[in-house]
Amino acid sequence: MQKSRILIASALALSASVTVGAYAQDGGFDVSQQIGPDPVLPEPQADLMPDLKVASVVGWKDGETPAVPEGLKATVYAKDLANPRTVHTLPNGDVLVIQSKEPAKSAPTRPKDIIRGWIMSISHGSGSAEQKETNLITLLRDTNRDGQVDERHDLLTKLDSPFGVAWIDNTLYVASASAILAYPYELGQNEITAAPRVLTPLPGGPINHHWTKDLALSPDGKMLYVSVGSNSNAAENGIEAEKGRAAIWQVDRQTGAARVFGSGLRNPNGLTFNPQTGELWTVVNERDELGPNLVPDYMTSVKDGAFYGWPWSYYGNHVDVRVRPPRPDMVEKAIPPDYALSSHVAALGMTFTMDSALPAAYANGAFVGEHGSWNRDSFNGYKVVYVPFENGKPSGKAQDVVTGFLDGENARGRPVGLGIDGTGALLVADDAGNTVWRVASSDGNVIPQPIGTDRVSANPQASADATTAPGSTNEVPGAADQPSPRTDRPSQPAQMQTAPAGDPMPTAAPAQ
């Protein structure tokens, strides 16, 4: 106990000194230079501790809503939630809200880890959310499609830090902190009482530095894709702790057979398929402690077998000299992401807009939820932005769409996961404000029928051919073109049987 007190005291003292010095480091850097396919990357700063500026959560007052541009209207969809992280629309229009908190971990011993834990507790607020039960999935039902929730049911409770979900064939898949679980569930049910089966284990504790596991269903309905964040900032816990991490796994939903699909992604979330191209996309939180203006978080398509740099490099061949031993071979393999969002915005949610009921200005692109910075002296993020697309790729600057989460030095809330509800409006999960916001067209426009988050085509290749970007002559890459999981590895791979990020997975005998 005395040792812990000494560590905490020294850590806080160190953080105070770093905070004072940090105000000279930002230098009025224009973060807009880091938005787009070719971000400005300043020289890294070798800081003992990152800059610290934490927005204390004060919550939303009655009647307050986020700010949106003309042509849009923001309203409360559901409130009094307990750390809502993600939202997911079922084919019948019901919306699932996944609420969770960080799982228990081994006690930190390094001063910087103690500080990080302290910062995270401040940035997520306190009060009613801490007293309410979390780690549950709540169903919200808008029976007459007027944009207001008429029924609310807790579908599952007492889960292990859930985050991502997917639904197909009367089965609800839930990605928890340590496994993908499969629950029998028919649309319209108000509760789930059956026990789940474990589809596949996922890398978990005791460190579990990035614990959120997002989930997406392939357009052909055969595969699940799950994000597994790194176990550290920049491999300071050793590369062995990163086996199977900083990656997106592909999982056969029938057998649980799994393989690493894309790697070198420090903390991927917001998994979603572009409905026009069939490509998998994600948003990624990049590394810290290289200064307030490095490294930009990003959104990117994820290619089968591609390596995106972490931990050895960022944005292609920009080497992180902190990582030992160096791996020039891995740096050479690293490919840059598609689109930078600027440094430390903490992008956690993403959804495409092609089939929404939003105005034409938002008809062909993606929304990104930026949870907000804590490690630079000027706040960055704390908003939802819109990135326009053309021919399957981002084609312009990100535009602020949902703002007002900051109130001076405090935060009313923090956006996380995004989705499109059964009427075609945008939903924003606000884990600090314990609210799901609905952003709709102010003219009341709605889509004719609900479209679920999981878009499954009966004929994936025909669907892909029909949605090929204008001018494209190649077949559209998508889940239908992806190789099936190999059968020479366990159907439920253990964490240590998965290779370090970026290296090929070892061959293993089938599970008995």
Report the location of each language-model feature.
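Beta-propeller domain segments
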Residues: D26-P69, S106-A107, D113, G117-K132, ...
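Conserved beta-propeller blade signature
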Residues: D94-L96, T171-V174, L181, M223-S227, ...
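Gram-negative bacterial Sec-dependent N-terminal signal peptides
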Residues: M1-Y23
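Residue-level detector of Asp-centered blade-edge/turn motifs that repeat once per structural unit
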Residues: L90-G93, W167-D169, L217-G221, N274-T277, ...
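Asp-box/WD-like beta-propeller blade repeats and closely related beta-sheet repeat scaffolds
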Residues: Q148-T171, S176-S218, N233
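Hydrophobic core register within WD40 beta-propeller blades
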Residues: V87, V165, L215, P268-L271, ...
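Surface loop/turn motifs at the tips and blade-to-blade linkers of beta-strand repeat domains
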Residues: V76-L81, H153-D160, L199-I207, V260-G264, ...
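Compositionally biased, proline/threonine/alanine/serine-rich low-complexity intrinsically disordered stretches
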Residues: V31-S32, P448-Q512
